[in-house]
Amino acid sequence: MEMVTIVKANALAKIAGNEVWIVVTDAKSPPIRPLDGVHLVDLDVNYYTDYYGLKGFYKKNRLHKERLEKLLNEIKPDVVVATGKHEKNFFSSLRLPSKPLLIREMHFEKHYRKKIKNITLRQKVSDWMATQYDYHWKIKGYDHIVILTEEDKERNWKGRKNVLVMPNPITSKCEEVSTCEKKTAITMGRLVPLKDFSSLIRIWGRVAEKHPDWRLEIWGKGELEAALHQQIKESGLEGKVCLMGYTAEPLKKMSQASMYLLSSQSEGLPLVLIEAMSVGLPLVSYMCPTGPRDIIEDGQNGYLVAVGDEKTFAERVCQLIEDEPLRKQMGQAGLEESEKYRIEDIAQRWMQLFRELLAKKSSRRNSR
């Protein structure tokens, strides 16, 4: 989320007439990417130090509200976009005489918590309450809600006129494009249950029976690393499925593969699929909610597979392995499709959205 926010802020700041601010609560370290013409304000609330427990959290939340309210009344912005961190607890109750346009960004599919396997009843109840809090109780004071995919809007926000769709942009660029000739498939992400890499390892077991000279690279770190290592060993896939660890150059690694695979149970908008397209990779993905359906046109730039259908997933991978011209054709189609996620285009779409929403808000005020 931090990377996407910085990339969008930098792009918006380059547009004539804009003044852009990023407000944070505890800037413990420099931004992960340099800011270009963007004001950075640290409210110095530091939620995770000094105070512990519920009482401490409420004190921090009150301090956060006071400092944010004071800042916004000083700079008097036309538009305020909340990303849904701690400010969601009080944002709609801020006293702002200048009446800016209040927008809430939602970065996750509404029911993503339900997709996590092997959780206790207590966790399920807690997750249900968190979903009600995030998606019902605390969004009523915003002028508009911005979500990532048309699929999410159709599934979870039907009939809500103030819900709009805006995809995230590609946050990095790579000059190298895949030749789609190397005998390597690739996937990336945190090694956590939601990404379901264990399913992908089982899928690759099927693939390896027909194509033992191909291998799968899994890039990322996380809590399931030891368990996945054990699964690979027990499946006899050592050397055919490789846990590669962390990389600071994900697009470069993608450009050295021939297809991208996604096995997640849930996503918001899987940026990795867009990044993979941007280096010319064909895609094979579960049709998890949400995102893959917005990105992949089945049979054109990749394949969509029902979640859990490991047999069909393996068949689609084998189809790409066995048909190099098809791999290259789909990779080229994805490369062209990725153009609409360029940050320059996304920034202009945000500007058009701001203009339209501000004009409507002004019209409503004048008609009173």
Walk through the language-model features, giving the residues of each:
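Short hydrophobic beta-strand element within catalytic cores of glycosyltransferases
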Residues: 282-286
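N-terminal strand-loop element at the rim of the active site
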Residues: 11, 15-58
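A conserved mid-protein helix/loop that constitutes part of the nucleotide-sugar donor-binding site
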Residues: 2-7, 183, 190-206, 223-229, ...
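Conserved acidic donor-binding segment of nucleotide-sugar-dependent glycosyltransferases
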Residues: 297-299, 303-310, 318-324, 339
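Membrane-proximal helix-turn-helix segments that form the acceptor-binding/catalytic region
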Residues: 69-70, 124-144
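Aromatic "clamp/platform" in nucleotide-sugar-dependent glycosyltransferases that forms part
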Residues: 246, 265
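Donor nucleotide-sugar binding/catalytic pocket of nucleotide-sugar-dependent glycosyltransferases
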Residues: 135-174
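Short His-centered aromatic/hydrophobic patch
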Residues: 82-88, 106
